[in-house]
């Protein structure tokens, strides 16, 4: 049975901005997937379910301006807040937007697993990872969202999704807890290295759940990095990241020991952002990343962007009413 997994940066989507955005079109896009990760969902995710208010009429209005009212009851959803006050994180500034992630999934296809205490394991922010300061790594500006999803027809198979929005610009020095002697491009690449080397490998290796026999792990989101094959300019994300048994990134695909190696592939070469000043595509920032087991076992075809710009009436209208990013899709098949 095939399943469609999506990633979509919805560009500062908030409950307050609902009047200026085409929620019907955004909901129609979401319906093309079985499960989707959203980036740049603001204001505590109120746009998902509606803003909680006391009076009945206010509740009705809030519901009308939500994605829930357009998706229906066969969707579950969860908003995640990556903000932290920990002293170990480099960014100490104040993001007044309140940017977060969201997972939305069809309840007739997926469910959250249950732990040994009988409690549902809902998506969460993933913070349990290590960084290598000798390689310029730090804690991420935004820790990723992490969701475990079991298939209803294959309860022992599990899809593990790690959604990310890699930092675009280096924060100003007054908003950093430590001095950084590299620029924004290197910071983006370092963040990807943390995601691949530390977070992906740890989540992929976790077989400690009695209810999970086969986990397939996928990073998805807005990397703010291009694949060179896309034709977009640098900074680049490597098409293949090779990691040894000590979780060190190797320089080339051929410089590795015989055992304990991760080959992690980053896919999706279509341009997926719209140019700020003209009506055309700009960058190839949105990707999926997964290991060879996942690629050879369940992936069907090449990931791609959805052709939604024409549906919206052109670049300008899409950019104003929907987003400056195009949703991307990965199709998998499990039997």
Residue ranges and their predicted role:
Residues 1-5, 107-112, 131-135, 139-175, ...:
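Beta-strand-turn-beta hairpins that frame and shape the catalytic cleft
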Residues 20, 129-150, 189-206:
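A Trp-anchored, charged/polar loop motif used as the substrate-binding/catalytic surface
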Residues 169-193:
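A solvent-exposed, charged loop/short amphipathic helix patch at secondary-structure junctions
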